[in-house]
């Protein structure tokens, strides 16, 4: 059986595995699964708003009603508010406690059910909660040490990812601003008309048709597209007689055009 040191190493090794995006569905499922295996429990990770980021069920404990929370990837507001008031790890909470993960209707089925909640912090901010639970068997001191380490590891992962996402957003906004600043009034008018032709973020357009409709030359449209493409705002591909295929890869351009 792995000792505390071996389990700790397994948890800290999670930092070597990156989470690509918080936008993906349940980005922390793999992490929750690894934590559940190491600590031998069910586990879930939620953010500050109660959105489910990942979970792992080693043991059946929930009713259909609670399973719906996991399927919807959102915990009830009342539970989220109660969890947000946990500032230090609360261990071995009984099924009678308001923070129990066990539903009211299953208290008789799992009278020995125990829940442990650990707040997740990063950069001095509350980022979410790590919740683990068992049908019975208290979480030992060794288990709770692993929980503290786990919440720290998850906090580092979340903070790093949020920082990366923020940096990416800033880069995209900067690219849009720089591209917009190179456009003349006529080119801005052309860009607004072009993007208005798209079906969502991509589509086919004919430059000459747009030019005639808004009263500018085709060369203005061509120049505007070239500037946007060189700035990494769009991708384009000639379709010959059918026109040009266009795809927006930096959606910040849409918000910027609303200011035009």
From Swiss-Prot:
What is the protein's known function?
A: DNA-binding global transcriptional regulator which is involved in the adaptive response to starvation and acts by directly or indirectly controlling the expression of numerous genes in response to nutrient availability. During rapid exponential growth, CodY is highly active and represses genes whose products allow adaptation to nutrient depletion.
**Source species:** Streptococcus pyogenes serotype M3 (strain SSI-1)
Predominant subcellular localization, coarse grouping: cytoplasm
* Protein's cellular compartments: Cytoplasm
A Pfam family the protein falls into: HTH_CodY
Which GO-annotated molecular functions does the record name? DNA binding; DNA-binding transcription factor activity; GTP binding
Q: CDD domains per the record?
A: HTH_ARSR
Its recorded name reads Global transcriptional regulator CodY
Residue numbers of the DNA-binding region are 207-226
Query: Which family is this protein grouped under?
Result: Belongs to the CodY family.
Task: Report the domain of life of the source organism.
Answer: Bacteria
Q: Which UniProt keywords apply?
A: Cytoplasm, DNA-binding, Repressor, Transcription, Transcription regulation
Any one GO BP annotation for this protein: negative regulation of DNA-templated transcription
Q: Where is this region: GAF domain?
A: 1-159
Instruction: Give any Gene Ontology cellular component.
Output: cytoplasm
Question: Which InterPro entries does this chain map to?
Answer: ArsR-like_HTH, CodY, GAF-like_dom_sf, GTP_trans_reg_CodY_C, Transc_reg_CodY_N, WH-like_DNA-bd_sf, WH_DNA-bd_sf
């Amino acid at each position: 059986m792995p000792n505390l040191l071996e389990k700790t190493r397994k948890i800290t090794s999670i930092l070597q595995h990156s989470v690509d995006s918080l936008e993906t569905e349940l980005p922390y499922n793999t992490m929750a699964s690894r934590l559940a295996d190491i600590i031998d429990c069910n586990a879930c990770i939620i953010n500050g708003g109660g959105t489910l980021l990942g979970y792992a069920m080693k043991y059946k404990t929930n009713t259909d009603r609670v399973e719906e929370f996991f399927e919807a990837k959102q915990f009830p507001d009342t539970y989220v508010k109660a969890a947000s008031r946990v500032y230090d790890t609360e261990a071995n909470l009984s099924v009678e406690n308001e923070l129990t993960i066990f539903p009211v209707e299953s208290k008789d089925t799992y009278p020995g059910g125990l829940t442990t909640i650990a707040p997740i912090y990063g950069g001095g901010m509350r980022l979410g909660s790590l919740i683990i639970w068992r049908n019975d068997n208290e979480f030992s001191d060794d288990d709770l040490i692993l929980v503290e380490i786990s919440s720290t590891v998850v906090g580092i992962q979340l903070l790093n990812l949020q920082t990366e996402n923020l940096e990416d957003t800033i880069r995209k906004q900067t690219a849009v601003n720089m591209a917009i600043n190179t456009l003349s009034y006529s080119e801005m008018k052309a860009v607004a008309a072009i993007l208005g032709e798209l079906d969502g973020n991509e589509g086919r357009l004919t430059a000459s048709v747009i030019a005639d409709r808004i009263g500018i030359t085709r060369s203005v449209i061509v120049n505007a597209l070239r500037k946007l493409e060189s700035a990494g705002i769009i991708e384009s591909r000639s379709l010959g007689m059918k026109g040009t295929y266009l795809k927006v890869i930096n959606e910040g351009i849409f918000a910027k055009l609303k200011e035009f």
